[in-house]
Amino acid sequence: MSLFMDKAQPEVWADAERFSASVREGALARGLTDEEAELIKVRASQLNGCAFCLDLHARQARQAGVTQQWLDLLPAWRETGFYSERERAVLAVAEAATVLPLTEESRADLFAARTVLGDEAFAAAEWVAAAINLFNRISILSEHPVRPRGADGRRTS
């Protein structure tokens, strides 16, 4: 079992949590919605294979108003007509910031996303994506466990 990075250096973890709160505050102030931010977090966590963050942010996305169907179809968002132009833009940012290095295609996606979102919300989306990628890596390296939950979202064990 890995060492929990957050427990080994709680002062660094506290700084990371403050950073995350600052990113969230800045994103909301610049026009990104909670729903959009959570879509970024879930999609990046899917791409990174971070079970702990997927569990957390899928719940938070539902609390923010994202439907279960939107979450279920997220891996195939490009193939559905369900997602709004803004949702598609933030999902493109999530993917470009997570799957590195940037390619010609991801650069084109970022350019299109910036056009849709405007500079402030676009930069906010990039910060949200960068932050969740940090937390994905912390959770993956720490092997943070996912606890079973019932239909009501409460832990069952």
Q: PLM features: what roles do these ranges have?
A:
Residues 1-157:
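Hydrophobic alpha-helical segments
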